[in-house]
Amino acid sequence: MTTERPMRFLLPFVATIALAAAPPSTAPPPATAMVSAVYDGDTMTLASGDRVRLRWVNTPEIRPPETYAVQAREATEAFVSGKTVSLLYGPGGNRDGYGRLVAGVMVDDDNLSIHLLERGLGHLFVIPPDDTDLTPFVQAQERARAAKRGIWSTPEFQGLLHITSFHANADGDDRENVNGEYLRVCNVSPDAIDLAGFRIVDISGNSYEFPKLVLPTGHTVKVHSGKGAHQVDPREQLAIYLGSADPIWNNKEDRATIYDRFGKVVDARTHSVQKETP
């Protein structure tokens, strides 16, 4: 009997812990909230425990550290600290694939994304579908670019496109998951760009040409290594497939360089696995 009592106590205790640990994905999304923590410029946690991915802006990453990441986080902290924020959701659902709320953040009549764009602490980043009038966001970004504020003073943001992420190592065996290799490329210019004739080159000089695809300002395209049907409707996540039967990118170290149709370098990004210090 003494062995049963702890078990009867333990089961509801474990259930309580499991419920507490589960992501709050089924509750209705809050319209207003207090922010309990800021991870980086575009990611924060609400007092409810919900994590929020900010709409309309992509800020430099804290890990691995990117230039102006700390300044972006500090700007977001100062904007939301001690204040009730309003959350603006889009037409495509309230949560992303990571379970985070996807929302704009307002304090009174001030939009956090515009606040960051104006200071050059991020670039326009549209998560489709999104029917927002982007004019004020583009204007804020262009004022920061013209003044060379923040990221616009760095070499990484001098082209029309910016590689925001580089997944050179697919999950599992790359040979069986070729499309698990991909880059995400954002149009950081104020105008739509036709990518026909652009190409991407790996560290060994192998070249892959982009198909015709119009990339609106602030939108991203996922560039997969393998075969598939191109997704060219900007109301959804844009995607192109380079058509390779085998993995393109080296898991240990590689470099992706994008050239425009005239052979000018638009952007480049390196992937490398850092060795642990003994």
Can you name each region flagged by the protein language model?
Residues 1-9:
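Positively charged n-region of N-terminal signal peptides that target proteins for export
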Residues 2, 20-278:
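Small beta-barrel nucleic-acid-binding modules, primarily SNase/OB-fold domains
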Residues 9-18:
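Bacterial N-terminal signal peptides
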